[in-house]
Swiss-Prot record:
Pfam family, one: Oxidored_q6
Protein's name according to its UniProt entry: NADH-quinone oxidoreductase subunit B
Co-factor(s): [4Fe-4S] cluster
UniProt biased composition (Basic and acidic residues): 239-251
Organism: Frankia casuarinae (strain DSM 45818 / CECT 9043 / HFP020203 / CcI3)
Membrane topology: Peripheral membrane protein
Reactions performed catalytically: a quinone + NADH + 5 H(+)(in) = a quinol + NAD(+) + 4 H(+)(out)
Length: 271
């Protein structure tokens, strides 16, 4: 009827949350962080043929303090896990993680002691991208889906305050260590392979032994040092053993007073 008020041209109504998330989505700067073969496909995605600058991502920052997206491109070795976590901690919040390739997501073909069986044991992951390796088109599709997730998320983003080894996944080795009466920290849970986790696992709901109870059969109290994995930094370490073993350990035979564990590259170097 001509009585309605009309907004003048050039005025846009939006919430502060939508505006902040739109800005984050449109200027998502990845960190320069390549680990293995998937990094080649990530570099191809940033080249002129696919041109990530269309999505505001042409700048791969060399400093984690200027990046807000970590693309874990390739398998993560046990020695690289602390470095990866340190880079993640240096990134400003809010920040996001994209696990590129099956090796980064679940270990892939590297089902052994040297490779982390899933990067989500080290850092929280927002988007998983399968493939070996995934093509640049697949990486772009995963990035677009991550953009949609950022746009629909809260203004505070996903803020995490965790440390290495504080993954939400259960750590049965810690439970088994406590039940075996070994000192806290005798096992480094960061260096356990998937086979070791299965070896030391305890059935859910199993009652904890009381004083004088039997030790879990999955652990051998005669040689606790032999069960300890090597250091994550590759150095040999020594774990002292009580020279006066318990009655249960004595029934299995005498054990050594000190054992040496070699590094992952070879025999004990006496470090």
């Amino acid at each position: 009827m001509g009585l309605e008020e009309k907004l003048p041209g050039g005025v846009l109504l939006a919430s502060v949350e939508k505006l902040a998330n739109w800005s984050r989505r449109s200027s998502l700067w990845p960190a320069t962080f390549g680990l293995a073969c998937c990094a080649i496909e990530m570099m191809s995605t940033g080249a002129g043929r696919y041109d990530l600058s269309r999505f505001g991502m042409e700048v791969f920052r060399a400093s984690p303090r200027q990046a807000d997206l970590m693309i874990v491109a390739g398998r993560v070795s046990q020695k690289m896990a602390p470095v990866l976590r340190q880079i993640y901690d240096q990134m400003p919040e809010p920040k996001w993680v994209l696990s590129m390739g099956v090796c980064a997501s679940s270990g892939g073909m590297f089902n052994n002691y040297a490779i982390v069986q899933g990067v989500d044991h080290i850092v929280p992951v927002d988007m998983y991208l399968p493939g070996c390796p995934p093509r640049p088109e697949m990486l772009m599709d995963a990035i677009i889906k991550l953009h949609e997730k950022i746009l629909a998320g809260p203004i505070s983003g996903r803020i995490e305050h965790t440390k290495i080894g504080s993954s939400p996944y259960p750590k049965p080795i810690e439970v088994a260590t406590a039940r075996a009466g070994l000192p806290e920290g005798a096992f480094d849970t960061r260096t356990l392979s998937v086979n070791d986790r299965k070896r030391f696992s305890i059935p859910a709901g199993a009652p904890a032994p009381t004083g004088g109870g039997a030790v879990e059969p999955a652990l051998d109290t005669r040689r606790p040092a032999a069960l300890a994995p090597p250091s994550v930094f590759g150095r040999a370490k020594r774990i002292p053993v009580d020279p006066k073993p318990s009655d249960e350990a004595r029934a299995h035979g005498p054990g050594p007073t000190t054992e040496s564990i070699g590094d992952v590259d070879g025999p004990d170097r006496g470090i």
